[in-house]
Amino acid sequence: MTHDHTPLALPSNRRTFLTRSGLSLGTVAMASLAARSARAAAPSNSSGLVGLPHFAPKAKRVIYLFQSGAPSQFESFEYKPRLNELHATELPDSVRMGQRLTGMTSGQASFPVARSKFAFHQHGGGGTWISELFPHIATQSDDLCVIRSMHTEAINHDPAITFFQTGSQLAGRPSMGAWIAYGLGSLNDNLPSFLVMISRGTGRAAGQPLYDRLWGSGPLPSQYQGVKLRASSEPILYLANPAGCPPQIRRQMLDDLRGLNQQSLERLHDPEIATRIEQYELAFRMQTAVPDLMEFSDEPEHVLAMYGPEVNKPGTYARNCLLARRLAERDVRFIQLYHMGWDQHDNLPDHMSKQAKDVDQPSAALIADLKQRGLLDDTLIIWGGEFGRTVYCQGTLTNETYGRDHHPRSFSIFMAGGGIKGGMTYGATDDYGYNIVEGPMHVNDLHATVLHCLGIDHERLTIPFQGLDLRLSGVEQRRVVSEILS
């Protein structure tokens, strides 16, 4: 196989650098940045790698609604009517086939099948089966592609989340947003190309930790890592000028600092110095762009109502979905939401009902809002967690409650928007929802398909690192799932 390698070499001159640079703040302190001023010419960071996109894209940007903790497919998008008659019977060994279990259930003496407590109904022209827990998402079914045959090798949360976010279970690889920002560049000179928001669910108090490396850039230049938007009066740290410092003075100090950094760059040829220069300049421009982003007074009441009652509370999933739409309007390339709290090992009916209420209306509103603004056609949306849940009960099964363990062999997600066929389902599992029987889609197949929607050949977006040609879709043979493409 021939790969189209693009080295991480420093641009040969200042003009090239300024037209190709992007930015991420990461953990760099920026307490001394200056205010916006007419003196500051905003350098363009719009250009990505030469030759990208490889072909005409269907999508310009991605919104990834990651449901951290792994929502159960049996209570969301995987309708298995036979589970009603199989309820409380033992999961046959012929179905499990000795497959690996977690330490939480491997010692159980019994593996009773647990039916879903919630009803399913068909929706839209495609007759998509969706749980009663998600009535608002169901209204968007004609725009959804529900994938019921996702699978992964990872059985524990952190490696499984890392796998979805970076294409590898090993920590330290570039995240999906970093790869896309690196390859395609930014569409907005005044905001980072990759922004991250985190919300906590109401269904479970404790959630899996989310480490900053999940939106990191790995061996790519640090300008491509994600920037976290916080739910506070200071959404991005260290953008404001120190109290009592006139903007003109801060601008002059920034110019002087740029000159010193430029001298160091010319002497040392360290790409991270170039990144630092652009970090300061973008942060300078963000002093105006971020307050404008966070100003919701221009949102009509009927739009706020679409997202539900939590939309006015900073840090909620609803608020973050509205922010995602505002970022899409501003052409941010990759918008990552994490919603924590889906790890329902016990008391699943109660916990999952609360989690679903957190995300159902805002997720549906985001899709509908993008569509009414003409943005859905070129915005790719992904909704799902890191693996699925077992058909058998973890712990004691009763008529009122049950829990489900981790299940990497098969689970469901949905996609919508740019490049994706709506109103369809893809893949199928057996009667127990345990093994895939049709259309398997690996995590790295998802990555290959996402890149394809953005006009990128996943086999050609690579970097050489420690003897490997790293790519988001991994080093094994993977495929674009053309069956779900519009």
Task: Cite the ranges covered by each PLM segment.
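Ligand-binding pockets and gating/stacking loops
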Residues: M1-S486
